Structures are given as C-alpha cells and as structure tokens.
From Swiss-Prot:
It comes from the Bacteria. Belongs to the histidine acid phosphatase family. Gene3D superfamilies: Phosphoglycerate mutase-like. It catalyses: alpha-D-glucose 1-phosphate + H2O = D-glucose + phosphate. Substrate binds at residues 41, 45, 118, 220. This is Glucose-1-phosphatase. It comes from Providencia rettgeri. The gene is agp. Its EC number is 3.1.3.10. The keyword Hydrolase applies.
Length: 417
C-alpha cells in the first residue's frame, strides 16, 4: 500500500456550525503511522445451522463437515495465518512497531476477542502468522462459549417505543430490497418443491412467505420466515465454496456462475443488513464495541494504549458499527458478501510530521472469494484486497485520509443514544 502525505485544508468559514474539514495530501515521506486498530470478523467456520430446518427445505443431503458447528476450520486457521503474515509485512513496511523479532509487549500489541472458539482461534492463528515464535497474549472472557458483552449485538433498550420504531425500521428496510430473483435461485438450488417443508407445511416457494421481525431486550434482533431460512442456506453454501469442497458438492454443483452467486448472496446480505443496520438498531447494538474502541483508541492520547490493537468479533459487529458511524456505501470487488469471512476494518492513525496534524484512514481489508477457496498465500507482493472507506461526516481527500478531529466527532455522534 502506498500512502501520501496529508496537509490540513483549513475551513474558510469562521462561524458556526463548522463543516467537517477536507484533508489534502502531497508528500508521502512526511507521513508517519502512529497507531492501528483492526476490527476483524473471525475467519472460515463451519455452518452454524447445518441440520434441522435446512434438511427440511431440500430433498438433497447436505455435505458433512469435520468440525463442530460454528467452529473455525483448519482452512480458516491457515487463511488467518496468511492474513497475519501479510499484516506483519505491512506493519514492518510502515515502521509501526520496533524492528525486532517479537515486538509483542503490551505497549506494542493488544489482541482481544469474543469468547467463542472461532474468534479466539482466529486471533491465535493471526498471531502465529504475524508474530511466529513469539509469546502473544490473547485476551478474552474466561468462559468460552459465552458471548462477551463487548461483542454481543443485543438490544439493550426494552421500551415499547424503541421496539415499535425498531420493528418499523426493519420492515421499511426490507421493503426497499428486491429479493425475488435471489429467492427463486435458492428455490431451484434446494429443489424446495420436493422438500419435506413443501409437503407438510406448503412451503414450496420462499418468496411467497411472510417474514416476522423480532425485537426483545437482551436478545439479538431476529426474524422468522423465509429470510432466516435463506440466510442459513446461503451461509452454508458460501462456506462450502470457501472451504474448498469439490465443485459438485458446493450447492450440489448448481451454483456455477458469478450471477448465481450474486443472486444468492443478496439474501444473506439482506438478512444481515435488515437486522443490524437500521440506524436505531445499529446505534443500540453496536454501542458496547463503539464505546470500547472510543476509550481504547479514539479518545486517548498516543502512547496510552497499544500501537496495534486487534479485535475479533462477528459480521453483526462490523455491519452495525459501520451503520452507527455513518460509513458511506461501499463495494468489495471479487466478493459477494458485504461483511466477508475474515474481513477487517482497519482504522489507521497517521501524523504529518511537518504540520504535526493527525489523520484517519479506514480500509476494508479482505480475502476474495477465490483467495479463500484457494487458501491463497498473502504478502505485500500477493496482498488481500483493500477498499478505502469514507465516513459521511469525515470527508476524505483523494488518498483516503480525513482529519483526526472530524473522526473523533464522528465517534462521539455514534455513541449518542
């Protein structure tokens, strides 16, 4: 990655309200990377739902997996080792940490994950790739299998008013989507017309069924109906592809064009976004992780916390945080998921050593669908994909930088309930 220098464009306006300030870049040599916070989705896991309803909506047998439901797979571990290796090369290139074998003190790095097997293991494999042979502490709650409150995207507002507004927001979001083609494609792949559900419950066409949204305090936003079934089915099919199952076992050999993959994943993306990205929901469920990031990265002086902070959670954490912070729409090339397996939001704090001004750059770093399937080695020469992101209230220059002060204001606004 190439980074160019930022110089601050001061606003000409001398009166309130002051608009966010546009940064500008000229000289890369003056830019210093001071601190990085990564919010990562865990890497490749087995399907969370691979029995029950999925066996009832098709007359076919789903492929077997060699690990427990929801666990990181061996390939997922290897993929994260490669991601860690790439990040270490990037860290060394930008001189973020000391030039030594194990820059792994608490002042250098801090790894913190949700307390599930797939998130803890992701951090362990990342550390093995980034800091091989080094002692690296992985911080998490002691009870493995129980969600850490920081990463738990549950509703914390139990008021009837909130529930009413949240349900309406989910309904409005779903109404704005066009999912008919995706449902029809999935009906064909599953051969749902010959399934047990069709014979016993007349569920022969997913698009003809209604969804019912669920908002309850201390629980994740939920939905019952075809969207939930579709999400579970498409998730299982995506994971088969990433894991490297033989082509005739991936969706029984029926998803063989980019157009078909795109259609199916409109359903999975719709599930994630309908449940977790309506603003009223996003700001509520993302508040714990936003607060953690604010106190450990955004609202502290440089040097008070580790230079490289690595958090491992879930797609719901990333989706809700991005909505709460008002990220602009983005596209991830060569991926069908909007929050892909192993994908990472990389928050970078840079300083212009001439002006002494600080800047923020945010990138989505992720493995393409084929990099995941091929278990592709990653390095500076063969990197993962990078997409520079932009926040609505933190305008970026041509090289993707926005002012640190505006970024702090974005975080403060996101934390407002």
């Amino acid at each position: 990655m190439k980074y160019k220098v930022l110089t601050l464009c001061l606003s000409a306006a001398l009166f309130a309200p002051i608009a966010p300030t546009m940064a500008s870049t000229d000289n890369q040599a003056d830019m210093v990377l001071d601190q990085v916070l990564v919010l990562s989705r865990h890497n490749l896991r087995t399907p969370i739902v691979n029995t029950g309803i999925l066996t009832e909506v098709t007359d076919k047998k789903w492929p077997d997996w060699d690990a427990k439901s929801g666990y990181l797979t061996t390939q997922g571990g290897a993929l994260e080792v490669y991601m860690g290796h790439y990040f270490r090369e990037w860290i060394d290139q930008n001189k973020l940490l000391a030039d030594e074998l194990c820059p792994t003190s608490n002042e250098d790095i801090y790894l913190y994950t949700n307390s599930l097997q797939r998130t803890i293991a992701t951090a362990q494999f990342f550390a093995a790739g980034a800091f091989p042979g080094c002692k690296v502490n992985i911080h998490h709650q002691p009870e493995i299998g129980k969600m850490d409150p920081v990463f738990n995207p549950i509703i914390t507002n139990g008021s009837p008013e909130f529930k009413q507004k949240a349900l309406a927001a989910m309904d409005d979001y779903l109404k704005g989507l066009s999912l008919k083609a995706g449902y029809e494609e999935l009906d064909t792949v599953l051969n749902i017309k010959d399934s047990q559900k069709c014979k016993t419950d007349k569920l022969c066409n997913l698009d003809s069924q209604k969804n019912s949204f669920i908002i309850e305090a201390d629980k994740e936003p939920g939905v019952s109906g075809p969207l939930k079934i579709a999400n579970s089915a498409v998730d299982a099919i995506d994971l088969q592809y990433y894991e490297g199952f033989p082509a005739d076992q991936v969706a029984w050999g029926l998803v063989d064009t980019p157009e078909k993959w795109k259609k199916l994943n409109t359903l999975k993306n719709a599930y994630q976004e309908t449940l977790f990205t309506p603003k009223i929901i996003a700001k509520n469920v993302a508040h714990p992780i936003l607060n953690y990031i604010d106190k450990g990265f955004v609202s502290v002086d440089k040097g008070e916390t580790a230079k490289f902070i690595f958090l491992v959670g879930h797609d719901s954490n990333i989706a809700s945080l991005m909505s709460a912070m008002d990220f602009k729409p983005y596209q991830l090339a060569q991926q069908y998921e909007h929050t892909p397996i192993g994908g990472k939001l990389v928050f970078q704090r840079w300083t212009d050593k001439q002006t002494k001004k600080d800047f923020m750059k945010v990138e989505y770093v992720y493995q393409t669908a084929d990099q995941l399937r091929d278990n592709a080695y990653l390095s500076l020469e063969t990197p993962p994909k990078h997409v520079t992101l932009e926040l609505k209230d933190c305008p970026v220059d041509k090289n993707g930088y926005c002012s640190w002060e505006d970024f702090q204001k974005v975080m403060a606004k996101a934390l407002e309930q």
